[in-house]
From Swiss-Prot:
One of its GO terms (cellular component) is Golgi membrane. It comes from Drosophila melanogaster (Fruit fly). Its main location: Golgi. Catalyzes the O-sulfation of tyrosine residues within acidic motifs of polypeptides. Has a role in protein secretion. Its EC number is 2.8.2.20. Belongs to the protein sulfotransferase family. It catalyses: L-tyrosyl-[protein] + 3'-phosphoadenylyl sulfate = O-sulfo-L-tyrosine-[protein] + adenosine 3',5'-bisphosphate + H(+). This is Protein-tyrosine sulfotransferase. Disulfide bonds join C98-C158, C227-C235. Residues 443-460 have a biased composition (Basic and acidic residues). The record marks K160, S287 as: Transition state stabilizer. SUPFAM superfamilies: P-loop containing nucleoside triphosphate hydrolases. It is an enzyme of class 2 (transferase).
Amino acid sequence: MRLPYRNKKVTLWVLFGIIVITMFLFKFTELRPTCLFKVDAANELSSQMVRVEKYLTDDNQRVYSYNREMPLIFIGGVPRSGTTLMRAMLDAHPDVRCGQETRVIPRILQLRSHWLKSEKESLRLQEAGITKEVMNSAIAQFCLEIIAKHGEPAPRLCNKDPLTLKMGSYVIELFPNAKFLFMVRDGRATVHSIISRKVTITGFDLSSYRQCMQKWNHAIEVMHEQCRDIGKDRCMMVYYEQLVLHPEEWMRKILKFLDVPWNDAVLHHEEFINKPNGVPLSKVERSSDQVIKPVNLEAMSKWVGQIPGDVVRDMADIAPMLSVLGYDPYANPPDYGKPDAWVQDNTSKLKANRMLWESKAKQVLQMSSSEDDNTNTIINNSNNKDNNNNQYTINKIIPEQHSRQRQHVQQQHLQQQQQQHLQQQQHQRQQQQQQREEESESEREAEPDREQQLLHQKPKDVITIKQLPLAGSNNNNINNNINNNNNNNNIMEDPMADT
């Protein structure tokens, strides 16, 4: 049966309405699922409080996300083992940002370790509902915020807190895709650097080479075990000596291990010191004056001849980890290998221009200090000048820069002389003040005797003054005697007035 035209029209409108309503309901439920479906309030609240994905934006408005699953880079090892050089070379890469050492993360990890070792603290946490998962999540978020926020955003984030590796297995538990670079250096060179530069490390007695070697042996043993437990796919041992002797070969291995593309900038980190998105330095890091230089051999064998004879004799027993790591405990110095030609050339040029590099180190540290004092304007101006000029090289030294360097050194020398003069004056004042105090103290001790003398003298003076009128003397003689008596009293009181 055929429907009339009017009925067909109504039917089409009804079908159209059904389609529109269906599409509206579908879209509405997609945007507002909680309106049609019951959602657990606790889960909803937790999802709002804990954001899995976080974002950072750089100066070019590029957005970077960071979370616990990201491939973080951790540089570990005993302090003074080349960790600062390693992070400076990585910082020169445009895709990597390490930044300065904070020491925050290892302290947080040590605090957590203390809680777990203490039965009292562990019980208190359990009773408070702080489970292992809650603790791990909180520590991971805290560490992630420190790593992500203490420098500029970058595709790959890195942290250089050497002692973090002592808890490397737990760090991998927090960040399963993270990787470690384990910096290894001859323990004799490390200990000599710690002692000569007076680097304070908990447990190290800087007055004893023997004790410091024992502490180094224990620390490196713990880190070596941690790296072995983490596995070769997550922890790579990097020998400082080989990195210095063959920088390009080892940096290619390191970047391949980290899944970071090759960039020649990592071989010239000194050109990016304190530049925007470059290699920031800190005035409190002990290696800042060294990493401003290109890769060189200066620090390779400074320890030779500096260690006491009895410690050298017992070295194999004091530090057995030397042999485990492949170092000869009886060789002074060991044969580390032959350096690349350009590294040897860098070393020769540094020796020829030692005063210039020392002056440059002072300038860089002063710039870092001014950053801490919020004088960023001065730093930006100096960076602009560096960018406008040709890049500094060792082979070519711009005369203007050389004269400025010389003037700066002269000014510093004059300031040091003035400071020494002021210190000498202050020392003299202190000696004079001390001498006055000693004199005043002796005067105080002698005061009772003097008071008794005055008491005995005063009656005689009174008798003399009374007897003068009886003898018919004039008033002038009386006044003179009175004035003489007053002068005697003043002489007795002057020393006490100085006090």
